[in-house]
Amino acid sequence: MADVTSMGEITAIAARIGVDLSQIDLDSIHLPPGEDCGIPSDDDDLMEEDPLEFDAGFGNILVVDNLPVVPKEKFEKLEGVVRKIYSQLGVIKEDGLWMPVDPETHKTLGYCFIEYNTPQEAELSKEKTHGYKLDRSHIFAVNMFDDIERFLKVPDEWAPPEIKPYVPGENLQQWLTDEKARDQFVIRAGNDTEVLWNDARQLKPELVYKRSFWTESFVQWSPLGTYLATVHRQGGAIWGGATTSNRLMRYAHPQVKLIDFSLAERYLVTYSSHEPSNPRDSHAVVLNISDVRTGKVMRDFQGSADEFAVGGTGGVTGVSWPVFRWSGGKQDKYFARIGKNVISVYETETFSLIDKKSIKVENVMDFSWSPADPILALFVPECGNQPARVSLVQIPSKEELRQKNLFSVSDCKMYWQSNGDYLAVKVDRYTKTKKSTYTGFELFRIKERDIPIEVLELDNTNDKIPAFGWGPEGSPICCYPSVTTPRPDIRFYSVPVWALTPGLVSKLTTLKGKQANALYWSPGGRFLILTGLKGFNGQLEFFDVDELETMASAEHFMATDVEWDPTGRYVATSVTSVHEMENGFNIWSFNGKLLYRILKDHFFQYLWRPRPPSFLSKEKEEEIAKNLKRYSKKYEAEDQDVSLQLSEQDREKRKKLKEEWEAWINEWKRLHEEEKMERQKLRDGEASDEEEEYEAKEVEVEEIINVTEEIIPFEESQQ
């Protein structure tokens, strides 16, 4: 902006240069549009005023249909109900709620108009209240007023839609058709994310896709392996396809920190927390449940972190994660969350509470779903004179199937078997003196009549058990370590079928003094790894439970994580960047043979790609098991070919190294021959390259470099 010059200054300047302003017709001077030469005009203040805003269109007006038709006496009550619902979602303008009335009957017409301050508030209200159930007979149908014009343009006569040619999408399960039946895994090291094949035959991984800055924190496979999820500041994204490099959908959720899939991959839960403006307040939490395929937000939950911090373990800002736990099965029909004195169970058909109310359970501490059936297991700790209890509740009827009271309980953990046949409840109880605790087990046989409960008797009643694990794939074998000593005992038990052996839980064996602090079952059962991680420096023992024998013992120094591949053929051990050295991973066979080792700086994540359950029937699987020798001939031949190929590659490698060595020797001989005359010259013309016997002599040569004469006075010499 130009400097402002007053009229007095202009007059002074004119007098100094000899110009008489009275002789000049200022009205005849025409300035360019918008130019005032630094002289303020009288109307500048008017020009600087904010322009008036006028409402354009009807984007801030809603039309709410399917309201009750009521007489004049109930008009104010209905208007109050509607105003209460919609004023929570935005600011309604003065006289912004209009409910038309039939002039003859003086009854409402079943719809109303609502005017908000902004179109954004109207859009939000439409999204939140469309389909709102006022009662069983009145479900709101909400539209924008602007949509009426669009509806009027719909032609009266139906015209058949244009049929577009079908374009098949990419097969998202293509990775399962690998001819070598290999499995994939993803790793994160530094800023790079890599998806690789585990090519155990070639004793190395094969790269599928690599990308830098693919995610801002971590990656996560969906439960069936169809999608790979990444996390960004703007929200989450899922990827899939042959190379896992195609982005399939994005989910807007600013500052998302955690994600979780439903078990059947139909829904994605995204979580974010935000710092409160008042330090005394807790973090604000936002949870969105989105449809995986369409990206549509089916329901969102908002509140303080305190509302989502009851029960569970892990998470951020005090929130237990996952907040929502999904029922077992292939339909993702129910999900639930724990609250203060309630369990809230929702159905995904409407994303509302079952029967519009939560299950009230005073002082409830934890719950878990059966992996196979819509059954909830609830744990309620002791409160006053009321004993602790574990209850089984059927959903959606909310009927209590079984209950067991527990006394002197310090802690309780529930462990479902993978196919939902058994529930093990690990109970830590106080001793009579209340100075220590001991562990016991209650086993619920879910599939048996009346759900009988059996107590697992321990050899040493003073044992405290930190870990427990069911054998997978329907195996009834469980084990746990005792930590009464630094080298715990590992014990194995068999849980027989109730109908055949009533009331018997038999111990199979005890492994004495093992250097282990964690157990990892193979997904296929039978095999497990006894691991001594972190403080035990990566001790590994590969154990066959059927034969009750150790197959191999090994070590992965400083190992922090162990993960079986989904088939149970291979296992990965890794050292993450919590240690500064030896970052990377090892791939082992199920029986403890080290196949290959990969070192990666700043390595911090390793995940096998899950596989969906087998589509084969039990009869077909039994048939394959019977004819396994016949089927295995093909794979044995392939293994033999690969072995021969590897041997040939090794021979070629050794041959190449030999040729490189011989080439180096020949080059050395050539240079030696070229320098022969020079060596002979240095040896006073004597050709001595071929001499085998020689005598080394050490010759000393004295050479006077400088002579200095100094005259010393006689008096000094006498002194």
UniProtKB/Swiss-Prot annotation:
Region annotation (Disordered) ranges: 675-698
WD repeats: 167-207, 511-553, 555-598
Comp. bias regions, Basic and acidic residues: 675-686
GO biological-process terms attached to the record: formation of cytoplasmic translation initiation complex; translational initiation
The keyword Transferase is assigned to this record: no
One Gene Ontology molecular-function label: RNA binding
Residues in RRM domain copies: 60-147
Keywords from the named record: Cytoplasm, Initiation factor, Protein biosynthesis, Repeat, RNA-binding, WD repeat
SUPFAM superfamilies: RNA-binding domain, RBD, Tricorn protease domain 2
Gene3D superfamilies assigned: 3.30.70.330, YVTN repeat-like/Quinoprotein amine dehydrogenase
Biased composition (Acidic residues): 687-698
Signal sequence annotation: none
Main location: cytoplasm
Domain of life: Eukaryota
Subcellular location: Cytoplasm
Keyword tRNA processing listed: no
Family: Belongs to the eIF-3 subunit B family.
PANTHER family: EUKARYOTIC TRANSLATION INITIATION FACTOR 3 EIF3 -RELATED, EUKARYOTIC TRANSLATION INITIATION FACTOR 3 SUBUNIT B
Function: RNA-binding component of the eukaryotic translation initiation factor 3 (eIF-3) complex, which is involved in protein synthesis of a specialized repertoire of mRNAs and, together with other initiation factors, stimulates binding of mRNA and methionyl-tRNAi to the 40S ribosome. The eIF-3 complex specifically targets and initiates translation of a subset of mRNAs involved in cell proliferation.
Listed name of the protein: Eukaryotic translation initiation factor 3 subunit B
